[in-house]
Each structure stands twice: as C-alpha cells, then as structure tokens.
C-alpha cells in the first residue's frame, strides 16, 4: 500500500477544510420518527455550549471553519451566529428547519433555503454564500434542487 505524506511536499502548501453543522441533537434526521418538529421548542438545547466548545478549540489552534447553520437555530441564538462571524469563520446555510431536500417539493425547498439565507444574513450582517443539504439529501432524483439553490443565492436582503 502506498503511503501519502502527511506533510506538504517541497514547494507545496497544505490546505485543509473544516466544516461544522450547527443543529441541535434533536434535529438530526435519525430522530425524525421520534421527535416531531412541534416538540423542538420544548427540548433542552445543547447547541450553544457545543458550538462554544468548538469555537474555543478552533481559537486555540488558530483554525477557521465554515459553520453550516440552521435558520431555526440562528433565530434562537443570534449572539452565537454573530460570534461565529466575529471570530473569523464563514457562516453558511444548512436550511431553516433541517428538512431533507428529497422529502420536499421544489417550492417548499426553495422557501426553506431562502428563509434560512435571509435570517442568517439579517442576524450576522454578512452575505451567506454556502449551503449544505441536511443529510446529504440531494441526488439525481431531485437535481431540481440545484436550480433552487442558485435562485436563492441570487436573492439579496
């Protein structure tokens, strides 16, 4: 088996990417059958202390990351979203309500990602350019989602 060097080769720079999904434990797709969206408000949130720990680690190592953040979380923790940006990280969208793209109509999907983009930009006062679909839910069967993402990207505050 050929080994890949763990340090840059002479004349080459090492480049890594770090991304974080900002969602609460009860919002993950695996829990959808057990935790209704109508129950989210009543759940004890862990997102704020968890993101604060991640921010502290990134600061300790001088690293930057992209935080794919739910609009739902941003509305409830605007100070956390502002801190992510203030500490030099990229803010990106993970949709508003962590709904799989594959389980939505094109219109519902566009509404979800559009709302998320507007909420994030209004709170953080930065342009949101990135998007990650919940549970990697875009594929050949719903390739229409790419057009929706492009349309949402063109929307300005």
What is the meaning of each model-derived region?
Residues 2-130, 135-157:
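Catalytic alpha-helical scaffold of carbohydrate-active enzymes acting on polysaccharides/glycoconjugates
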């Amino acid at each position: 088996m050929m080994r890949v060097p763990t340090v840059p080769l002479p004349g080459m720079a090492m480049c890594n990417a770090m991304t974080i999904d900002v969602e609460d434990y009860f919002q993950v797709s695996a829990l959808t059958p057990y935790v209704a969206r109508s129950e989210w408000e009543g759940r004890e949130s862990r997102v704020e202390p968890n993101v604060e720990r991640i921010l502290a680690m990134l600061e300790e190592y001088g690293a930057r990351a992209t935080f794919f953040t739910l609009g739902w979380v941003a509305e409830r923790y605007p100070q956390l979203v502002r801190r992510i940006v203030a500490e030099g990280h990229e803010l990106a969208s993970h949709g508003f309500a962590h709904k799989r793209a594959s389980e939505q109509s094109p219109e519902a999907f566009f509404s979800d990602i559009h709302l998320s983009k507007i909420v994030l930009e209004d709170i953080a006062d930065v342009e949101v350019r990135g998007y990650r679909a919940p549970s990697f839910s875009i594929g050949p069967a719903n390739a229409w989602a790419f057009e929706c993402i492009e349309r949402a990207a063109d929307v300005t505050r």
